[in-house]
Amino acid sequence: MAAKEVKFSVDARDKMLRGVDILANAVKVTLGPKGRNVVLDKSFGAPRITKDGVTVAKEIELEDKFENMGAQMVREVASKSADAAGDGTTTATVLAQAIVREGAKSVAAGMNPMDLKRGIDLAVEAVVADLVKNSKKVTSNDEIAQVGTISANGDAEIGKFLADAMKKVGNEGVITVEEAKSLETELDVVEGMQFDRGYISPYFVTNADKMRVEMDDAYILINEKKLSSLNELLPLLEAVVQTGKPLVIVAEDVEGEALATLVVNRLRGGLKVAAVKAPGFGDRRKAMLQDIAILTGGQAISEDLGIKLENVTLNMLGRAKKVMIDKENTTIVNGAGKKADIEARVSQIKAQIEETTSDYDREKLQERLAKLAGGVAVIRVGGATEVEVKERKDRVDDAMHATRAAVEEGIVPGGGVALLRASEQLKGLRTKNDDQKTGVEIVRKALSAPARQIAINAGEDGSVIVGKILENKTYAYGFDSQTGEYVNLVTKGIIDPTKVVRTAIQNAASVAALLITTEAMVAELPKKGGAGPAMPPGGGMGGMDF
């Protein structure tokens, strides 16, 4: 085991704080409409330019092990926010830095770190309650477009595309973002069903560039059990070959001889075939296979129904205009199912949603509903160069997650103002002792950091702007750093999804509060880079002393 270095109290916290600052300072330049870009060096290909906080955070690795620990903890804040809400990563980083900074000062002054943490947790609860109370439901398409625009750094075109996509596939549909081959950004809406299972073997791939299977006008065999041998299937496979159409097999699993035979036939070109595992587990899998059957106008082959594989005929197979399968997902587009059957299935699922008491079941039922009733919208992001396309794609991704979050939990005023207003609610918060009170105060100060940073990035004086906003008691009153004016942010369309703001403060406080309770840090000692072992004596030709 390698030797370790241990640092304690002030030493440890100073090093950690330096790491936090390096990462947060690199990330926070991207905050707000006038935030700048960060260029990331790539070991291969062109450098990447981005304004996405989490992308910057993920690139940072520091040489000093102790500083790196601090940086990685804050990186965790950004990636957790990205996972939960898909946006708000920079805000979360700025908040975490502010809490750690203030907290470290208080610990250095001799306060109890555990009580500080309790105070911080109390404050965060109060802030979240205030955000939820003042959250406003998203009702119009315009509001969705505004959320998208703000999240895409003021790019109204992206906001409009997202609002259109949400309108076409509904709040329950699937939206994906791809890189376009042209200069223009375009929206493509595909009716279809997507589930999270990819191809069983990469040998089924038909489009090697995108590593995916693309099949047009395909037959779909929906089988509930495993396929290990193909003997029972041979009559059906021969019938499919006669039609010249491709076949997609959806089964619990395809293994051994069956998989080998399918792959060999696919490679020889005799049979256009691909196999995917059935989505879900247990009863849910049965229900999802039934959904696919109804959508494609086929029959789910199940022993419960007394149908055996050898008796399956072509008219029992589902049909779809297009099936796309990549490593992780399968999308079935334009299934041949009857509209009346699909509608009956949709209302059946809606009835189950009404009846269920389990949140988990409800969520899964809603997913199934989305797959049947919604569709798939693809936003293809264009640009002049690859670097520009990647940068725009980052922003579209952020905006897409933000619009989803807005529909889920509603909206609050943007520009860091919702957090500023929440900080006012902390003034009378009751705590058990003075150290907890200081913990609350730490959060209260930190809540002004995002608004301050947005102003600083716009070349304004952060403290003056924050003071001005707090003087006016109107909840939505704030500073539009794009135009440099004080306005009602909601009517101006400067809004943030409640979920994004909520996860930002929760994740920031969670990690930052733990950081300030750190008393010792352990890291491996850097290896000393000495020269290699010397040549053994007596090398060369024996007996010849020079």
Swiss-Prot record:
GO terms for molecular function: ATP binding; ATP-dependent protein folding chaperone; isomerase activity; unfolded protein binding. The keyword tRNA processing does not apply. It is found in: Cytoplasm. Its main location: cytoplasm. ATP binds at T30, L31, G32, P33, K51, D87, G88, T89, T90, T91, G415, D496. Its EC number is 5.6.1.7. SUPFAM superfamilies: GroEL apical domain-like (SSF52029), GroEL equatorial domain-like (SSF48592), GroEL-intermediate domain like (SSF54849). CDD domains: GroEL (cd03344). It catalyses: ATP + H2O + a folded polypeptide = ADP + phosphate + an unfolded polypeptide. Gene3D superfamilies: GroEL, GroEL-like equatorial domain, TCP-1-like chaperonin intermediate domain. GO terms for biological process: chaperone cofactor-dependent protein refolding; protein refolding; response to heat. InterPro entries: Chaperonin_Cpn60_CS (IPR018370), Cpn60/GroEL (IPR001844), Cpn60/GroEL/TCP-1 (IPR002423), GroEL-like_apical_dom_sf (IPR027409), GROEL-like_equatorial_sf (IPR027413), TCP-1-like_intermed_sf (IPR027410). The keyword DNA repair does not apply. Signal peptide: none annotated. GO terms for cellular component: GroEL-GroES complex. Keywords: ATP-binding, Chaperone, Cytoplasm, Isomerase, Nucleotide-binding. Forms a cylinder of 14 subunits composed of two heptameric rings stacked back-to-back. Interacts with the co-chaperonin GroES. NCBIfam families: GroEL (TIGR02348), PRK00013.1 (NF000592), PRK12849.1 (NF009487), PRK12850.1 (NF009488), PRK12851.1 (NF009489), PRK14104.1 (NF010704). Together with its co-chaperonin GroES, plays an essential role in assisting protein folding. The GroEL-GroES system forms a nano-cage that allows encapsulation of the non-native substrate proteins and provides a physical environment optimized to promote and accelerate protein folding. Belongs to the chaperonin (HSP60) family. This is Chaperonin GroEL 6. It comes from Bradyrhizobium diazoefficiens (strain JCM 10833 / BCRC 13528 / IAM 13628 / NBRC 14792 / USDA 110).
